[in-house]
Amino acid sequence: TKNVKDLKLEWSYNLGSSRGVESTPIVIDGVMYVTAPWSIVHAVDARTGEKLWTYDPEVPRSYGEKGCCDVGNRGVAVSNGLVYFGAFDGRLIALDAKTGERVWETDTIENRDKPYTITGAPRVFKDKVIIGNGGAEYGVRGYITAYDADTGEEAWRWYTVPGNPDEPFENDAMKMAAETWDPSGKYWEAGGGGTVWDSMVF
């Protein structure tokens, strides 16, 4: 606390939006990566505040109505020279950390008739990128999906709540969970919720 009086603004950076910012910045090798509303990624020199590059995934503005709580984004994951982030419209995108050029993109949404979104930051573990989704407020079924970090190919998907009990269950855990849900409520038609819209730990 002795040096608090010496703190001063070193630099500021305009993210280009009057909307709220929910992203947690990540600094790697002197570069700060931060996301703005509409899932726009900024790379900034952490020492000077100079913009290095930006990437706009061009989420259709009409897609904003599918979110409950604005079009925020909680940040990126960085690993092995790639920056990973989820776009609000459900795409998972990998960028070159130095140039901001897109390396790959994949659609994480299993059913485009449902109002799925992504607002959370992905996680990287070994050679997998893991991401959840949002949309429980409007009746979707939650799941977590892992993708190959180099190619974007889907590796596995794990649902957080059971689906239609008249259809085969994905695993024994979903069968066990379904036995605790009252089928008379037809929860699978409402989606079931359970979206993993923010931080994950493992």
Where in this protein do the model-derived segments appear?
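Extracellular/periplasmic catalytic domains that process cell-envelope and extracellular macromolecules
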Residues: 2-3, 45, 202
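Repeat-blade elements of multi-bladed beta-propeller folds
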Residues: 20-40, 65-91, 117-141, 185-202
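Aromatic (tryptophan-biased) beta-strands that constitute blades/sheets of beta-rich domains
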Residues: 1-15, 50-65, 101-110, 153-161, ...
